[in-house]
């Protein structure tokens, strides 16, 4: 009887040879792909390093801007009244001159006080401080403080007299005016 079946060893050798031939292009492709993958990896790592450096620079710049802003605010608070104080210096000079005057001339003293009052009023106006003199106006509890109510010929709740002026600075009340108000009839 003739052996029609091939030797199993021969078959395995042939399969191994075919597999080796088929694996060769795959191995070669893998070898070719490895440098490309390494290059892509190196490029990605370089990009990451660049982005990290850019992030750190941006973070440092943001911190510098924040610090400068804080310094500016601190300086603004520290020197906020500098201009106002400069406007008050002539008033101080006038008061010192009046104290140093020993002439005893009341007319001269009165004139000096009036001049000093004008200087002070001017300094306050430059600092946006405005006087409240609300005679004849309707009573406003935000601007006025009623001390008393008196019978008057004026409309009820109208300011009849100002006992002490009030003051505002840039539309904000520094001190309300002390007033007497017409009582309802």
Swiss-Prot record:
Region (Disordered): 1-38
Composition skew (Low complexity), residue ranges: 19-38
One GO molecular-function entry: protein-folding chaperone binding
Keywords, alphabetical: Chaperone, Cytoplasm, Stress response
GO cellular component annotations of the record: cytosol
Transmembrane segments: none
Primary localisation category: cytoplasm
A biological process from GO: protein folding
Ranges of biased composition (kind: Polar residues): 1-11
Function: Participates actively in the response to hyperosmotic and heat shock by preventing the aggregation of stress-denatured proteins, in association with DnaK and GrpE. It is the nucleotide exchange factor for DnaK and may function as a thermosensor. Unfolded proteins bind initially to DnaJ; upon interaction with the DnaJ-bound protein, DnaK hydrolyzes its bound ATP, resulting in the formation of a stable complex. GrpE releases ADP from DnaK; ATP binding to DnaK triggers the release of the substrate protein, thus completing the reaction cycle.
Subunit structure: Homodimer.
Membership in a protein family: Belongs to the GrpE family.
Name by which UniProt lists this protein: Protein GrpE
Organism: Burkholderia mallei (strain ATCC 23344)
């Amino acid at each position: 009887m003739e052996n029609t079946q091939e030797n199993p060893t021969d078959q395995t050798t042939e399969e191994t040879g075919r597999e080796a031939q088929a694996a060769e292009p795959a191995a070669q492709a893998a070898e070719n792909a490895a440098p490309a993958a390494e290059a892509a990896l190196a490029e990605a790592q370089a990009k990451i390093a660049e982005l990290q450096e850019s992030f750190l620079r941006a973070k440092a710049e943001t911190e510098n801007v924040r610090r400068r802003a804080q310094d500016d605010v601190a300086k603004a608070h520290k020197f906020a009244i500098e201009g106002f104080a400069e406007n008050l210096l002539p008033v101080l000079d006038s008061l010192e001159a009046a104290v140093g005057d020993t002439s005893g001339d009341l007319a001269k003293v009165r004139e000096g006080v009036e001049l000093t009052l004008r200087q002070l009023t001017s300094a306050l106006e430059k600092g946006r401080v405005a006087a409240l003199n609300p005679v004849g106006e309707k009573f406003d509890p935000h601007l006025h403080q009623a001390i008393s109510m008196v019978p008057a010929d004026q409309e009820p709740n109208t300011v009849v007299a100002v006992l002490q002026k009030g003051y505002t600075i840039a539309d904000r009340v520094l001190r309300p005016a002390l007033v007497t108000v017409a009582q309802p009839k």
